[in-house]
């Protein structure tokens, strides 16, 4: 039985094209160049934050976020940055009686933006809210503690094997992989994916049918 579905944020619900484009602008480099280096860093298995260091050695992401905010150019996103399938899929799950959560590695500011979008979710939380960061077990323990069921009744949805699927699986949840965004396409053929993803999707529109099939009473 699937009682709860919890979504990652970046590249699962939110298209981060605009966000990373503004980072390229802030660094003063062409967006195409930034995207190419960003993808190469991910493909090499490095932390995505290392991409910034290629353009500005010693780059401190938290410090630069503060500088952007002080300059009136904070990281931001809105309704137009949501993937088109995000809101309908979440609403369909709630209509089915499934508890819907949103939990990702995001700042408190991003959490406020998410709550302001009035998403069809029962819970919205960020790593800043919990003081716990993926892929740490404490983050996924917080997910389990927030849901109205045990780990076996939760499906965690994300685009990354390392940050989303593997740690959620290790905590006893089921997992759904969404192939989109840089990580989604790069991780699609990763050798660890078959063992860490219970389902693979190309759109969140597939989720309600997945849940319905699992929850359908046996005849």
Each language-model region and where it sits:
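N-terminal helical cap/lid subdomain that shapes the substrate entry/recognition surface
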Residues: 1-98, 107-111
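Asp-based, Mg2+/Mn2+-dependent phosphohydrolase catalytic module
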Residues: 1-5, 87-219
């Amino acid at each position: 039985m699937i009682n709860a579905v919890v979504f990652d944020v970046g590249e699962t619900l939110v298209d981060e094209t605009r966000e990373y484009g503004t980072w390229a602008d802030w660094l003063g480099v062409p967006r195409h160049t930034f995207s190419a280096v960003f993808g190469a860093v991910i493909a090499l298995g490095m932390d995505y934050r290392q991409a910034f260091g290629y353009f500005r050695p010693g780059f401190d992401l938290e410090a630069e976020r503060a500088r952007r905010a002080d300059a009136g150019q904070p990281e931001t996103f809105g309704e137009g940055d949501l993937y088109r399938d995000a809101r309908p899929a979440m609403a369909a799950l709630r209509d089915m009686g499934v508890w819907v959560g949103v939990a990702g590695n995001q700042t408190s500011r991003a959490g406020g933006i998410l709550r302001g979008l009035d998403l069809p979710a029962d819970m919205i939380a960020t790593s800043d809210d919990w003081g716990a960061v993926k892929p740490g077990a404490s983050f996924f323990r917080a997910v389990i503690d927030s849901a109205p069921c045990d780990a076996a009744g939760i499906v965690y949805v994300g685009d990354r094997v390392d940050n989303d699927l593997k740690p959620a699986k290790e905590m006893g949840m089921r997992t759904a992989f969404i192939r989109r965004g840089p990580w989604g396409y790069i991780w699609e053929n990763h050798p660890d994916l078959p063992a860490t993803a219970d389902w693979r999707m190309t759109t969140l529109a597939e989720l309600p049918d997945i849940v319905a099939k699992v929850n359908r009473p046996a005849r």
